[in-house]
Amino acid sequence: YIAGRSDLIDLAGERLTCPGEGREVGPTLGINRELLQGLFFAPSVVASSLKTAILTSKVLEHLGYQVEPRYDEVRADIVQNIIFNNKEDLIKYCQGIQMASPIDSNAIPVPWDMPGYTDQVIMAAGCFTQGSSIELSCDGPLRSPYIAYQQGGLTYSYGKLGIMKAVTELMKGKNEL
């Protein structure tokens, strides 16, 4: 339900359905529940994604990797860039994200020739909804400086688990683990 002044209720109806039609006709086609669930959960999911990005930045910077933005910088979105400077670390990190995923955790992402890219790309995203990078995903082109673009984390607990597994895979064979 939406409650408040009638002019604000009308504006909300216009925003949630169809401009000019408002609450009376809007093209919801039986998806009101899903639309409202999205509005309800969005603040929590975005907060979890931001916390996951900040934690990623802090942990990877502590391990000696360059990150953008840094954990203590102002953020404009939920994407965390991790600069690995070598393809092996980029691949291992993305594979670790996939291993911690709720869907297809047994899949092993490998670099491939993706249409539209001049370099091979590795993509990790074991998501409930295909293509939903907000759940937790990590990808990057295999070219210098080998940047991983990580985003998402439906819950902060899941985001932390993903980072822990990715760092574990990243550090295999290195003395710092």
Please annotate each region the language model reported:
Residues 2-89, 162, 170-177:
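Active-site C-terminal subdomain of aminotransferase-like
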Residues 69-70, 76-176:
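Conserved C-terminal alpha-helix-loop-beta "cap" of PLP-dependent enzymes
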